[in-house]
Regions:
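Redox cofactor-anchoring modules in respiratory/redox and cofactor-processing assemblies
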Residues: 1-186
Length: 186
């Protein structure tokens, strides 16, 4: 709805001239993390994470290095810096294994703890589950507990295999979209 008046004034051709072959137009994104400028910003769908982080948001704060991009909010996933040239359109994001979700992303520097970021996402999804299906109701709690163990120094190498197994099981057996995406951050 944010673009309707501009499209009516300038025409559909004007709007379709923005974006790329995968998606036309623009999208409003919520930006956060260790970038100099956070907030809501509108971008052409062909814009990349790198362009947003460096050219629009002023780069990573305190001249640190980009460690990870968390795309798609709490049901989204993590991307390494090597994927920063990915365009912010639906298909390009799916190609690298993340969803657009709420059209948000956070860019974090090397001081961020990926385990803590994953715990936050899993904890949020655990609180939001309806509890109808066992994979979400029990599986998300088990995953959160394993992540707690790892972050508090009680983790074992076999916990990684258990986490992977739990994530795969939840992804395949959950009854709704929340369950299917609740473990993407892990």
């Amino acid at each position: 709805w944010a673009t309707v008046s501009a499209i009516l004034k300038k025409g559909s051709g004007w709007y379709a001239s923005m974006g790329n072959d995968n998606a036309k137009g623009t999208k409003v994104w919520a930006l956060s993390g260790n970038i100099k400028y956070n907030g809501l910003m509108e971008f052409d769908m062909s814009t990349t994470f790198h362009q947003v982080i460096e050219d629009v948001c002023g780069g990573i704060s305190k001249k640190k290095e980009l460690k990870i991009i968390h795309a798609g909010g709490v049901t989204g996933g993590f991307l390494p810096p090597s994927k920063a040239n990915t365009a912010l359109d639906y298909e390009s994001l799916l190609d690298v294994g993340v969803l657009m979700g709420q059209a948000s992303f956070a860019a974090y520097d090397e001081s961020a703890c990926v385990i803590d970021l994953a715990k936050f996402s899993v904890g949020f999804n655990e609180a939001e589950t309806c509890g109808k299906c066992t994979p979400c109701r029990i599986g998300l709690t088990l995953i959160k507990n394993k992540l707690d163990d790892i972050s508090e120094g009680r983790g074992k190498i076999e916990d990684l295999d258990k986490l992977q197994s739990l994530c795969e099981e939840i992804n395949v057996t959950a009854l709704c979209g929340l369950g299917e995406t609740a473990v993407k951050a892990v």
